[in-house]
Curated annotation (Swiss-Prot):
Name listed for the protein in its UniProt record: Uncharacterized HIT-like protein ML2237
Source domain of life: Bacteria
Organism field: Mycobacterium leprae (strain TN)
GO biological processes: nucleotide metabolic process
Position of sequence motif Histidine triad motif: 91-95
Length: 134
């Protein structure tokens, strides 16, 4: 059965995409730890990061680095946080989010009900930042 991320990638469910190529996509999470919290996901369904083909994992990491630069620029952040948790959705994904503090590295701090407007604004800011970086 397809994961929720595969359904988002295939446009069966909505997603706020900020990056996409043949192997990897990046879209905003619906439960951000900070504004601009983005998920970087391989298009292929791979459950655990340690089982992914090294070439695909390299692409996921390269896109995560690009998204990290984008979220830092978009939100004037000191750093980009990165987490590979491996729970909730059985499809490899890397959390990339703008941060100024180690205290942001907690899923207990997520916004469980962000406004659609704030997510749309974050998407626009990240896409603009990525365009500037290109």
């Amino acid at each position: 059965m397809a994961t929720i991320f595969t359904k988002i990638i295939n446009r069966e469910l909505p997603g706020r995409f900020v990056y996409e190529d043949d192997d990897v996509v990046a879209f905003l999470t619906i439960e951000p730890m900070t504004q601009g919290h983005t998920l970087v996901v391989p298009c292929a369904e791979i459950d655990q990061w340690q089982n992914v083909d090294p070439a695909i994992f390299g692409r996921v990491i390269a896109v995560s680095q690009l998204i990290g630069k984008g979220v830092c620029r978009a939100f004037n952040a000191e750093r980009a946080g990165v987490i590979i948790a491996g729970f909730e959705v059985p499809h490899l994904h890397i959390h990339v989010f703008p941060t100024h503090s180690l205290s942001n590295f907690s899923f207990a701090n997520v916004d469980r009900n962000p406004s659609p407007e704030s997510l749309d604004a974050a998407q626009d800011k990240i896409k603009a930042a990525l365009t500037q970086l290109a």
